[in-house]
Amino acid sequence: LSKGQAPQPYSTQANLPSQVQTQAQKIPGMNTSGLFLNLGNDTDGSTDNGTQQVDGLALEMGNQVPEAQRGQSVRFHMLMGQDTFNYIVQQKIYNRNGIAALTSSLNFPATAWELKTSWLWIGSDSTFQAQLAKDGYFIAQAYYVDKQGQYHTGYAGLSGMHVINKLTHDWVWTTFENRNNSKYTVTNGTPAKPMTNITGPTDAAQPVNATFQQQNPTLAQYELIGVQYDQAQAEPKLLANSQLESAFQSHSSCLACHNTAAYSSNNTYFNFALKEDGGIVYPTTVLPDSDFVGYQKLDYVWSLKRAQWQR
């Protein structure tokens, strides 16, 4: 939280900003009493940036999106389970002060989980909304704050999802995305090309997809890309979501990257970018323990890096 504040209890309901309520009343079909996703705050200094990926880049919408949405950033949202939240509060690591004071590595409970999702911004364009619904996108009410501090309210379509559970010592990393994403998201190259996933679906995921898609027709355009759960398991070595790790899929491993989550009072957060190719390559195998001498491991939870100093 801003200024390293202690969070309210997990079940505390956040009030919908008045600007969002006012804008929502003008959009056909919006339920102002319903759920709205907060898709980030892009103002300078915000602790809740909704567009930046691990490599510092944003993924843009393009290809078959309407002209008004062309170049709009794909937006991100993160949730954590109550046991994850409670452990953070109990350990007093909700701010940077608590993390810097650690004298031992963290060990989240086996019931801990996090969920990270990516969303295509629709706004109030009903034609684009119908197009995405036809392509099997789950649609939600949402809002975000732009760089100028202005609120934007509308609809958003779910394009990707990481599900992270501590069902094993190394956590279980499961990733899904809509198979029509190449129609609506593009690479950051020149010229921009349709964004595709180069890491899956893996061979193990394909029969799971066939069963799931048959049983759940309304969500049948979503597919499991793959699962990682054990650092001793050789395959899949690479696992990425084209919406969440767009530009570095060839150097993406959920498990190996998050295994580097660590903090040192002398060196701050562990730098998981390897020195090759200008420091934009990330580990695809778990680094040796010797690399973490002087660090306290954060039990794979890199989201703790958002913690702010108490002020």
Residue ranges and their predicted role:
Residues 1-256, 261-311:
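Conserved small-residue
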